[in-house]
């Protein structure tokens, strides 16, 4: 378990700063810059990013940002001043300036897709293209569809179990849970939270048996604290970039699984907004495409990116 909790990152970890916050990133490969923005917010950055970097290192300089609150940048204080969309976007721009890239291609996974789209709206002159992998919706209007879809995928017994487990771990704050799961993995609150998340993650797969594959790494590496802040910001500010996206002409790949729990309305809206986009759909596949249908996922991804460097 300690091996799972103490992640080893690549040898090329570098740092930069946004105000007084130090942030980290990794580089691999040679060629045009491809920035990889992972999900969450708060997800451990290495999977599937390392596999993607290995498959594209001959064509791109792959730049993996450890987003604030995740990976080696996990130390960032979690509050409304540090966890907001604008700060995440500023991090990307400061990283681009640090590296000196005039233009970048952005690959966004889930939440990372939201950042990729929003960054492109703010800095269109610096973006050569987008790859959106199961990207989050570009508008608050579809934000809660995810939760509704997940609810319908759970059995009554699963819902009962989640309610029971939540009563146990909700006695701790998110910050207390995050500290406790590393200090005392067998604490009752941690065990309850872990079992709760195991049920939650299953709804994100087409083949539920595959949810267990990287769950240990995901659970102990994931910092769940930033999520409520972003959910709150999106809904309270009525965050929506759909009109701005329609002004972009850059090439875009929209790739998603047919059974993604975000719902196809999310990806239809992306297609409506991004006029120069290509849509690819993987059948019998949920949100975690690289686990549900890895061969098809990497085939589509590498084929598109090696043709469009």
Predicted regions and their residues:
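Conserved alpha/beta-hydrolase
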Residues: 57-74
């Amino acid at each position: 378990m300690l091996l799972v909790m103490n992640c080893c990152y690549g040898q090329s970890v570098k740092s930069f700063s946004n105000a007084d916050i130090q942030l980290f990133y990794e580089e691999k490969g040679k060629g045009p810059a491809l920035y990889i923005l992972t999900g969450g917010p708060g997800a451990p950055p290495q999977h599937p990013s390392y596999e993607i970097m290995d498959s594209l290192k001959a064509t791109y300089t792959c730049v993996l940002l450890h987003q604030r609150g995740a990976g080696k940048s996990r130390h960032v204080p979690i509050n409304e001043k540090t966890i907001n969309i604008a700060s995440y976007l500023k991090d990307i721009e400061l990283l681009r300036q640090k590296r000196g890239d005039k233009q970048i291609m952005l690959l966004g996974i889930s939440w990372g897709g939201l950042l990729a789209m929003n960054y492109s709206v703010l800095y269109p002159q610096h973006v050569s293209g987008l790859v959106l992998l199961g990207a989050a919706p570009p508008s608050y209007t579809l934000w809660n569809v995810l939760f509704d879809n997940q609810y319908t995928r759970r059995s009554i017994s699963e819902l009962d179990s989640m309610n029971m487990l939540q009563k146990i771990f909700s006695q701790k704050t998110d910050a207390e849970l995050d500290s406790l799961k590393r200090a005392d993995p067998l604490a009752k609150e941690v065990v309850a939270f872990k079992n709760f998340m195991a049920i939650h993650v299953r709804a994100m797969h087409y083949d539920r048996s595959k949810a267990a594959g990287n769950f240990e790494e995901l659970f102990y590496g994931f910092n769940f604290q930033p999520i409520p802040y972003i959910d709150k910001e999106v809904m309270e500010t009525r965050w929506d970039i759909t009109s701005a996206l329609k002004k972009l002409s850059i090439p875009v790949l929209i790739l998603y699984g047919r059974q993604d729990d975000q719902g196809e309305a999310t990806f239809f809206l992306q297609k409506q907004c991004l006029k120069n986009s290509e849509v690819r759909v993987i059948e019998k596949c949920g949100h975690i495409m690289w686990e549900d249908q890895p061969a098809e996922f990497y085939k589509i991804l590498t084929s598109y990116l090696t043709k469009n460097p």
